[in-house]
Amino acid sequence: MIEFQHVSKFYKGGKVAVDDINLSFDKGEFICFIGTSGSGKTTSMRMLNRMTDPSKGKILIDGQDIQKINPVELRRQIGYVIQNIGLMPHMTIRENIVLVPKLLKVPVEERNKIAEKMIDLVELPREMLDRYPNELSGGQQQRIGVVRALAANQDIILMDEPFGALDPITRDS
């Protein structure tokens, strides 16, 4: 379970990004934050994976205050698809997909199976696994960003405008 308890985020100059939110999500729930630009959606997700910390309040995962969890360890437990894709340009598509499983010490053979399963999931040819991000279209890169977040089978997956770079035909299929 994820809980936001009276969580607020203030930036310099008094700008309020998130103001006293109280939310609770049970395991297995699919939640969407919908709002205008600047309404705190991204900030809320960034607080959940400790890319930024709340100014006030607590965020709990399974009853544990995330401020007491090492941020690197916390992030290894959370899949995250960011707005601007975020693929590592010096790594192949295979290496990008299995980045977190590698950090989690998953054996190479199993990582290769994961990469193949994930690229099949987004209906891209397996030959693309040995290419680099700059050799793929923006929509293809976005799909790789999504499956990278799924590759380690984490309990929490955060998606911040995950389909922003997809063309409407791909997005609707």
What are these language model-derived features?
Residues 94-102, 112, 116:
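Short helical segment in ABC ATPase nucleotide-binding domains corresponding to the A-loop/adjacent helical element
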Residues 65-79, 103, 109:
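ABC ATPase NBD coupling module
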Residues 109-127:
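Conserved ABC ATPase "signature" region
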